[in-house]
Amino acid sequence: GTTLAANPLVFAALSAALTHLHTEDTHAAMHGGALQLERGLQAVFTARGLDWHISRVGARLEFGFGPAPHNGSEAERAMRPTLEHALHLWLLNRGLLVTPFHNMMLTAPMLPSAAIDQLCASVGEVLDSVDLGASQA
């Protein structure tokens, strides 16, 4: 999060963003991309018999290495740092970035559908190349 300082420049920038950038068209594109990404990742996980969860709010998605946790203890038990590091390095080496620590992604209005497909395919490739049982550490 950020803090808005109460000055004329900030309010002018906010007004311009709300008028020209945050439109129904851009939101529709973001949500369409997020839906494609959610479905693509779910297909990757399902095809490999993984019960991993995807959380989505608008154009923001993240996934976890197990069912959706109900509390912090469950979330901690689902953490798989070795797998997470391998996943992030694999993706970085292919020009793709997923937010560290919680595997978060945002879909921008101009994000091409092909980029979403590439990310989903790359996640599938890394999962096919690691021993998921050994990555519990």
Each PLM stretch: what is its role?
Residues G1-A137:
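Conserved N-terminal phosphate-binding loop of PLP-dependent enzymes in the Aspartate aminotransferase
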